[in-house]
Amino acid sequence: MDTPSPDPLPSPLPGEEEKPLALSPPVPRGRRGRRPGGATSSNRTLKASLPRKRGRPPKSGQEPPLVQVQGVTAPVGSSGGSDLLLIDDQGVPYTVSEGSAAGPEGSGPRKAPHFCPVCLRAFPYLSDLERHSISHSELKPHQCKVCGKTFKRSSHLRRHCNIHAGLRPFRCPLCPRRFREAGELAHHHRVHSGERPYQCPICRLRFTEANTLRRHAKRKHPEAMGVPLCAPDPGSEPPWDEEGIPATAGAEEEEETEGKGEPA
């Protein structure tokens, strides 16, 4: 059986010329198939229309929101006073002065510090204040499983566990000695550098450690235990001379020498 042949293409009419098909140029696309100026611009517009976080002063022309704090309702940034009642990210209200809340022009409000009620130390974030409050607490929740000793912080427990494990991770680069803590290594460096930052104000001897200076003062100068051991004080007793040595030092030795006298 013969297969029918396809119909031939119609020939152009006389007087007409064949023209190529006109294709539109491809539309450029951004990354991930986004058209430039399309979804990105709409996202930016959407973000700009979203409300800002709590704690920022309202724009001019808008009524400030009301905040309920201990039964007292006060508008944030009200013109009745120079203080601003704000709320941080944790939902805790705090009051700052209008001058301190506004930072440099165009930088927005500056976060007010949180003060420790015990030592009045200031912290920029509430989490830092909560971490600091552990030092004033008597609780020691971290306990060593070997000896049962308790600690306030987990870092102190990890450092203590190095004693039972025999680990000394801090090694001196100048000698083979190793230490459990970085502070011990820093003190050991004074042996190689010759640094003696602690000086006796009476005999002017210098020491590497503060404990060594205290032992020296108890043994050599028991009568001057009330004298400051770090630096001479011109207003303290006994009086200090220009070199920082007590003016009465050595007076008893001179009296003993004069009392004996030379043999006749």
From Swiss-Prot:
Single GO molecular function: RNA polymerase II cis-regulatory region sequence-specific DNA binding
Gene3D superfamilies in the cross-refs: Classic Zinc Finger
UniProt zinc finger (C2H2-type) residues: 114-136, 142-164, 170-192, 198-221
One of the GO BP terms on file: regulation of transcription by RNA polymerase II
Keyword terms of this UniProt record: DNA-binding, Metal-binding, Nucleus, Repeat, Transcription, Transcription regulation, Zinc, Zinc-finger
PANTHER family: ZINC FINGER PROTEIN, ZINC FINGER PROTEIN 771
Family: Belongs to the krueppel C2H2-type zinc-finger protein family.
Function: May be involved in transcriptional regulation.
Name recorded for this polypeptide: Zinc finger protein 524
Organism listed in the record: Homo sapiens
Chain's gene name: ZNF524
